[in-house]
Amino acid sequence: MTFPRALTVIDDNGMVISIIFWFLLIIILILLSIALLNIIKLCMVCCNLGRTVIIVPVQHAYDAYKNFMRIKAYNPDGALLV
């Protein structure tokens, strides 16, 4: 069975359609790559936001607690004998 000659614009044995499909495939791969890069950027932004909002303030609070609870070491020269 052959394709009707009236509908054939260029007899290139499917080369034009093949090229169109390859271009579509390349465009889809590029779009997926861009989407993947944007997802990775979003993950990095979320990690930085979590560090800024949660980890750094908790670390400052813990440092303040450590400084507040620090007890000076016993110094025998400074002790008062009663």
UniProtKB/Swiss-Prot annotation:
Principal location listed in the UniProt entry: host cell
Stretches that traverse the bilayer: 20-40
Highest taxon of source: Viruses
Pfam families according to UniProt: CoV_E (PF02723)
Any single Gene Ontology cellular-component annotation: host cell Golgi membrane
InterPro entries: E_protein_aCoV, E_protein_CoV
Protein name stated in the entry: Envelope small membrane protein
Annotated organism of origin: Porcine respiratory coronavirus (strain RM4)
Subunit-level organization: Homopentamer. Interacts with membrane protein M in the budding compartment of the host cell, which is located between endoplasmic reticulum and the Golgi complex. Interacts with Nucleoprotein.
Ranges in the topological domain labelled Virion surface: 1-19
Keywords: Apoptosis, Host Golgi apparatus, Host membrane, Membrane, Transmembrane, Transmembrane helix
Family according to the record: Belongs to the alphacoronaviruses E protein family.
Membrane topology: Single-pass type III membrane protein
BP GO terms, sorted: disruption of cellular anatomical structure in another organism; viral budding from Golgi membrane
GN (gene name): E
Function field: Plays a central role in virus morphogenesis and assembly. Acts as a viroporin and self-assembles in host membranes forming pentameric protein-lipid pores that allow ion transport. Also plays a role in the induction of apoptosis.
Cell compartments where the protein resides: Host Golgi apparatus membrane
Intravirion side, ranges: 41-82
